[in-house]
């Protein structure tokens, strides 16, 4: 408290409430708020309502005690010289009484609840006299209304004409900075209510314009956020409000104003010096936000005022590219055509209130004026002086209160008098504002409090012009205005007004019919004639022109048609009943043909194949990724929307005749432009974040990319073209790549490289403010959050994320080489644009964006370093067979996609790699490693690693802006593709990669790289990405598992196969080098090195002390794994650790060499771990997806086919769509292949879940090849599906709502990420467990699982498809579709969840239980300490992935990891962890160790659910440990159970989706997902270990403890665990449930019966699920009996949720509608059916 000069002063702070005293060093030059935060941080006890504690200066030397105003500087308050050290008290802000007016009794009598309520009523009724009377009696007005949480002052601030009331309250002891229960001060409340009069009064009373709310946001931020009358914004700025406040996502006021199109606020902000170049956590400037949200007016203002349109976000995207990605072509045109010569900076100087005393010392004072945006040409010297530190008060209100008050009143009176004449008579603002510089435009710098200049510029009197208006905007008078002051002009409704300048007090100067003068701004409204009319009128022409620009090559790099090689072919596809056609359709969504669409050489049709499953039906028919559909069954579909095309495909049944056109760019240019050689087909994935956007958007983005980097588009196209050139590899890979995040080698610009480094933690990532990130979950920047939530957001996030992805994980792939942007950008925009912008999935990287973003570029840098890196990979690829290479490329892409998500990538890697692995097993490393080394993969992996680093800062942003994308990425990453591949390469150069670092990175890369199914995976991933923000994630998830499967089965596997093979393959592939050795490395990988002795903490990524419980647990797991070589449980453990840290490291590391070292442990050893990460992501993703959009979800699940177009705007899972029960069909087919277990399921899932049915189709082929692995694969796939499914759907529901719900439960935010993670977790089992499963088959369990698999497969025709779907393909499709929006939404939510989840990953999975928001910060912290990735959704995923990985590890070790690990990754990964994951996630410390955490979380959650929750949690712990050892499969089962149940219940909560999920989980994911519906069937399918594990799981569950609640069920235990999670998740889930369920229901319904029966057989293996409930009275039914009964009434999809929630027979009659919704039965029909069946039971 010394002079301002003193740096820090030691202050003794007494905390009477805690009876403590602390000596703290406080900065006297900082605001009291900062000191208060220091004190709060120093406390070891939490204080209730801590925000309303303040520093109190005790009375001394005759001076009354006073609370220090929070926005004043500490040094403004002279210290008490009576004490050796300055002494302050930290106490609750109560009224400060001058003397003891009343004794305690009297005080208590006065402050009764009745009195306080009466007082609030008086305030509400404006009874100023009564309020004054009570205050005179001594009532303390600083209290919260128990009902509303308001305090008297905040309530009064929201009332009109409350000036006197506010004064009375203030004089009666009300603290101006007293916060409501919501953390808002009266200034915030007045601003949010746009109550200029109250705001003026408060400011006059000495309130600071810069009070922070609970999120650290100022009233100005809220003003920009809320919009409306800009007068409050003007008042705040006039009163020296601080500019540049950032939320958790790095969004500043300017970003929010642009997000919501608040043009006037934006202009005021710019005028007062807002930084137009400010970048949020994703690197997006306000112009990027405008481009994303299509806020043309704001964009025009920004450009007019000199905003730099060339600034790139962390995805290396310019605003123009973002606009293209978002499908906002008109805006893109505006940005593109803007010239610097059009810039007109502000020539005026802002005026400031002179009353407010400027604090010279305040650091803000001077800078603030200097903060003026580039637009202001003349920064007046006085300006700085004029603007006081935000925290400064005009006068110390304590000392100068009276003077201030008098002055205020004086000012107020004078101003108000003038004001009152004005239209907004009550707008004290005029006076206040006016006062400031009546004449001078300069800010009245005078610190003098007096300066009642207000009268000079009475608003009514001569109006003072603030600044000239931006030309080109059209306004119409919406209400009449009659002049009331000099200079005003009359307005009549409907008159066109030309606005000339903006004046003070809400007055504008304009010209109307020749009259020029002033009028109130609220009398006119801007009309977007051009925007709407033009859009409708000339959309066709505009589209043509834009497409010409963007797609045909009017851009720098784009040239004419001659650039393209057009190859048309007719393909006749004949598929079997339960399989899909093996391709994912994507394209513009439109109810009616889009006549405006004009085919171009680049985009000959609206619908194109986003991915083709390698070796699938479509693949064998010669179809390749990126082929455009010209005719379907003889019907021309060039201009037809997605749904209709899907319908046409479905109508054909099992036969499909398609005429397609392959558009490839001429190779020469491509190679010349692109660094990546043919192998880099995945390069497209590295390409821009075009994936999500509609093809048109994508193409355009490509063009824009090209534009920005001539080589980029070429790269993208080249990649796309290259695939066409080499249809096999190139096609699948590059096409997929195109759709996916941009390929690693796509375009590594210097910016990207730097960005990459930034991401890696090099200087670049400065932009990821950890703190910002941290807060993100709860307070995601509203704009970004909403943006994410909105379709656009989905789109943009894709775009944003895409950018992020691009930079961070190679995240956004260009659209398919030939992917045509859907001409109807608006449609995309409206209906599916978000999905269109799969690019956002990369956003997962966004949280890490800063870091990751950088990272991505780094990848690119690597790529750039070159294309060489990519090429290196590519080179190895080159040697590989085309299919494999393709896969690799794809895998790479997927990895890239997944790279952003550490966890994600890791787990998919195993999945992805397995398919390839079988082929390259001998040399999986080599081939994989090349890819892994590939820049793209590396980037991908690195991205995850990056995310770790970025964790804290980026997490938040990610969440908001990129969370979705990141989550999507994460989800996608986890995809089998990512995980699988990462793993495969991992063995190769994973050896060196000792730390968790590698695994994340390696895993991501490895996954993608590692699988022979890179192509399919990539495709799938692309599809996913395309589908939505989550697309990437989903794709990765879906792709990954198939990838993993594929390797298992054969080099060129469909995604499905990969998925199927993932488990087996993963285990196999991961283990490929040597199952045991691989596992060992995995274990070792989990530790730090290949050796099993060192383990890496899943959360922190730090090497574990060998003696630590976690390390011991890991070692035990490793041993178990070693004994069960095939499983990859160790991998899971390592994966999480390695993943988190690894990704960072990997990110930093060079793709090749780094990746090798990093990846080797992760890849091989962490294969399981990786799988968990991906699985988790997947789980997360599904949750997210579910959350993402109920509508999408529903589409995703049941109507994936039609739904897929829904969100993805054309993405469709042909497989799934072709057959409503595609999943069923798939399942059947899969089971048919002989790998009924996982393999069929994954296939199915893939078909259903992802628009990559083709891969699925391939899986069938694959499946036979890899029966055992298939099993694992199947498991994995379902997990994948889950991941995809859940998250998006939930996201779909309102982001905010969901978040709140989830927050309430403590799961929503986590579920999004977590769900993503969990879902991913589910898929991970496939990859992770797959190996386990594969081994399991080798062991007894898999085989057990195997038999069920067929059943499951058949059974899960729907479910399995669903599982499959959940696996990713179907879900992914839908998911991705919904993911775009939901992802975005999720992004925000995810942020919280992510953090929370991260925490869990830490091992504190239960943290999630806490309100997501609170945990979030905590989570961040843990995450923070862990790899950065935790922070982001990715982080979250990572954490999930860790959990998953750990769980995976555990399950792999003890239980066929295939099912368990992945499952745990599920939303309930944490919960899952409870079981398998606990070991896995905390597995390092020890299964038990992990379990307690998991258990605690589980128990809290389960307790909430009140169902064996605790036992579930605990049992899993115990059981896990034992299961891990006894039945490796069992542990997996346990983990899987945990995961699967989570997936299952998640799905259950989703309702129909749940069915799919559930089905998928048990069958596809190992029985977890479908366990609830047909656990046995599903389990038998043992897509994941569960089926065999089911028994094992059951025993394990039971062994673990029926308490797990899943005892009966393999996931029974986990389900309860999940249940808690589910409960948490449910809030977000229900929304998605509603939609998804509907969709699922449709599909689920018919399939359900089949799957249900299937479970029956499966039940045998599962024992628990198929209980003879008919022989028992309802009251004696166990939860499994309830599940069997549900299946008997064809509502098996809800089984998982019911079991997760431990719903037993006795509970059924008492279930309410709300209970059913929580249980996922969101469809009225389903609920009625259940209730009807219950009545029948009662009757019988």
From Swiss-Prot:
Q: Which residues carry this modification: Asymmetric dimethylarginine?
A: 966
Q: Which PROSITE patterns match?
A: ANK_REP_REGION (PS50297), ANK_REPEAT (PS50088), PDZ (PS50106), SAM_DOMAIN (PS50105), SH3 (PS50002)
Q: PTM Phosphothreonine: at which residues?
A: 913, 1131, 1235
**Cellular component GO terms held in the UniProt record:** ciliary membrane; cytoplasm; dendritic spine; glutamatergic synapse; neuron projection; neuron spine; plasma membrane; postsynaptic density
Q: What is the effect of changing residue 300 to C?
A: Disrupts postsynaptic AMPA and NMDA receptor-mediated synaptic transmission as well as transsynaptic signaling and spine maturation. Slightly decreases interaction with SHARPIN and SPTAN1. No effect on localization
Tell me the keywords, alphabetical order. Answer: Actin-binding, ANK repeat, Cell projection, Coiled coil, Cytoplasm, Methylation, Phosphoprotein, Repeat, SH3 domain, SH3-binding, Synapse
Tell me the Gene Ontology biological-process terms attached to this UniProt entry: adult behavior; AMPA glutamate receptor clustering; associative learning; brain morphogenesis; dendritic spine morphogenesis; embryonic epithelial tube formation; exploration behavior; gene expression
Query: Where are the annotated ANK repeats, by residue?
Result: 148-181, 182-214, 215-245, 249-278, 282-311, 315-345
Q: Which InterPro entries match?
A: Ankyrin_rpt (IPR002110), Ankyrin_rpt-contain_sf (IPR036770), PDZ (IPR001478), PDZ_6 (IPR041489), PDZ_sf (IPR036034), SAM (IPR001660), SAM/pointed_sf (IPR013761), SH3-like_dom_sf (IPR036028)
Please give the annotated consequence of changing residue 678 to A: Almost abolishes interaction with ABI1
The residues covered by the SH3 domain are 470-529
Localized where? Answer: Cytoplasm; Postsynaptic density; Cell projection, Dendritic spine
- Polar residues compositional bias, start-end: 1123-1132, 1496-1506
Q: Where is this region: Disordered?
A: 354-466, 664-687, 759-855, 868-1053, 1115-1199, 1211-1463, 1476-1518, 1556-1594, 1637-1673
| Phosphoserine carried by residues | 373, 375, 387, 394, 482, 694, 781, 790, 801, 891, 898, 1135, 1160, 1164, 1167, 1254, 1421, 1511, 1522, 1530, 1549, 1644, 1646, 1648
Record's domain comment?
In isoform 1, the N-terminal region preceding the ANK repeats interacts with the 6 ANK repeats in an intramolecular manner, thereby restricting access to ligands, such as SHARPIN and SPTAN1.
What's the subunit arrangement here? May homomultimerize via its SAM domain. Interacts with BAIAP2, DBNL and SLC17A7/VGLUT1. Interacts with DLGAP1/GKAP, GRM1/MGLUR1, GRM5/MGLUR5 and LZTS3 C-termini via its PDZ domain. Interacts with ABI1, HOMER1, HOMER2, HOMER3 and CTTN/cortactin SH3 domain. Is part of a complex with DLG4/PSD-95 and DLGAP1/GKAP. Interacts (via PDZ domain) with the GRIA1 subunit of the AMPA receptor (via PDZ-binding motif). Interacts with WASF1 and CYFIP2; the interactions mediate the association of SHANK3 with the WAVE1 complex.
Regarding protein family, the annotation reads: Belongs to the SHANK family.
Query: What is this protein's function?
Result: Major scaffold postsynaptic density protein which interacts with multiple proteins and complexes to orchestrate the dendritic spine and synapse formation, maturation and maintenance. Interconnects receptors of the postsynaptic membrane including NMDA-type and metabotropic glutamate receptors via complexes with GKAP/PSD-95 and HOMER, respectively, and the actin-based cytoskeleton. Plays a role in the structural and functional organization of the dendritic spine and synaptic junction through the interaction with Arp2/3 and WAVE1 complex as well as the promotion of the F-actin clusters.
By what name is this protein known? SH3 and multiple ankyrin repeat domains protein 3
